Amino acid sequence: MNWLYSKTLGSIGSCCIDTLPWPFHSFFQRNLLALPGEPGNPLESSATESGKQSRSCLSASPVMEEEGCEHSLQKNPTRQLPLDPGQELTKDLKEKKLTPKRLQLLLVGKTGSGKSATGNSILGRQVFESKISARPVTMAFQKGSRELEGKELEVIDTPDILSPQNQPEATAKKICDILASPGPHAVLLVIQVGRYTTEDQEAARCLQEIFGNGILAYTILVFTRKEELAEGSLEEYIKENNNKTLDALDVACERRHCGFNNRAQGDEQEAQLQKLMEEIESILWENEGHCYTMELPNVSSKTL
């Protein structure tokens, strides 16, 4: 009878296991196909043994902590298998503490792109001076902060640091002296819809000269005057505006972009903030919650 039970269950189990993502193969082959009363059956294993099994199936992930993994699987060792184990694994990983409680966001862009107005939209109040002017309005670094989704957002508005007239090395040192530790977790490169000009291209180039090519892994393209797109989507605008340079920049930033109507209120304002936070969470996840750092010439490695 035991032979028949084992044979039938083994055939069914093997078929199911073949459809699972790789981290679960060894776990289920070793434990869930065991007969009742045999060693290795998880329903008869102790909590300690369950913890050991969890480490073996997830130890390949560099962002998982052994203690956290063990704790999460001990809560319900007899829980039913999810319909999509891979999805639950991703959820468990993302629930790890990769998001700092305090996030520093750096606003950059050419003069007139709407940096200050975007900063005010993120903060939910008027903090930075914002007006239409042919000359730069923001003449110095300014900071504002707010609580959002249980996190403290520190938004830093910048003067015209991406001007081609500036010396990249001198600008980088000045930024390091002014910005507080731990440094920016995301850089918001502000671009006005419908006006991706040569100056915008120069601003993107200067951004990389100042911070290094690695900065694009922390950069989100923020398009202001989103309302001018009317019924069209931002994705369509980027891909169909016949501007290969803009599309290439978006690709370099891994398609992280969002649109802002800086006159929006209520639900529209909340929706665009939510989209921005999703892009920020994406950066934090990909970089394991670390802020951006760079090497300065003739200076030891310094955190921006």
UniProtKB/Swiss-Prot annotation:
Residues 39-86 are annotated as: Disordered. Expressed in B and T-cells and peritoneal macrophages. InterPro entries: G_AIG1 (IPR006703), GIMA/IAN/Toc (IPR045058), P-loop_NTPase (IPR027417). Residues 224-227 are annotated as: G4. Residues 261-263 are annotated as: G5. Residues 136-140 are annotated as: G2. Residues 43-59 have a biased composition (Polar residues). One of its GO terms (biological process) is autophagy. Keywords: Cytoplasm, GTP-binding, Nucleotide-binding. Residues 100-301 form the AIG1-type G domain. GO terms for cellular component: cytosol. GTP binds at residues 109-117, 130, 225-227, 262. The keyword Signal does not apply. It is found in: Cytoplasm, Cytosol. Residues 109-116 are annotated as: G1. Its main location: cytoplasm. GO terms for molecular function: GTP binding. It holds the Pfam family AIG1. Coiled coil: none annotated. Residues 157-160 are annotated as: G3. Belongs to the TRAFAC class TrmE-Era-EngA-EngB-Septin-like GTPase superfamily. AIG1/Toc34/Toc159-like paraseptin GTPase family. IAN subfamily. PANTHER family: GTPASE IMAP FAMILY MEMBER 6, GTPASE, IMAP FAMILY MEMBER-RELATED. This is GTPase IMAP family member 6. It comes from Rattus norvegicus (Rat).
